[in-house]
From Swiss-Prot:
Family recorded in the similarity comment: Belongs to the universal ribosomal protein uS14 family.
GO molecular function: rRNA binding; structural constituent of ribosome
NCBIfam families for the chain: PRK08881.1 (NF006477)
Function: Binds 16S rRNA, required for the assembly of 30S particles and may also be responsible for determining the conformation of the 16S rRNA at the A site.
Pfam family, one: Ribosomal_S14
Organism: Baumannia cicadellinicola subsp. Homalodisca coagulata
Keyword Ribonucleoprotein attributed: yes
GO terms classed as biological process: translation
GO cellular component terms listed in the entry, alphabetical order: cytoplasm; small ribosomal subunit
Name this protein carries in UniProt: Small ribosomal subunit protein uS14
Quaternary structure and partners: Part of the 30S ribosomal subunit. Contacts proteins S3 and S10.
Length: 101
């Protein structure tokens, strides 16, 4: 199991990303707009850099919902490969069975 502090940190990152999502999009549009002046771009870049680091979506880590494991995460199930295999062997995932050819 993952430590509670790490889970809390991930939860904080999710909340911050939602909070600053619209602001980040607006600033990125100003930066990428070819019609905006260089001064507007620089101001937008500085404002973007002043936002909290954890408000960026790329700082979030996908984790297994049961164990909190960060590696070998399968998005389709929201679980790590180990827990998907265990659930599949018990027949808890409909339509999923062991491959044989």
């Amino acid at each position: 199991m993952t430590k509670q502090s790490i889970r809390a940190r991930e939860f904080k990152r999710i909340i911050l990303a939602k909070k600053f999502f619209a602001k980040r999009i607006k600033l990125k549009q100003i930066i990428s707009n070819i019609h905006s002046s260089s001064e507007e771009r620089w101001n937008a870049i500085i404002k973007l850099q002043q936002l909290p680091r954890d408000s960026s979506r790329s700082r979030q880590r996908n984790r297994c919902s049961q164990t909190g494991r960060p590696h070998a995460f399968l998005r389709k199930f929201g679980l790590s490969r180990i827990k998907v295999r265990e659930a599949a062997m018990r027949g808890e995932i409909p339509g999923l069975r062991k491959a044989s050819w």
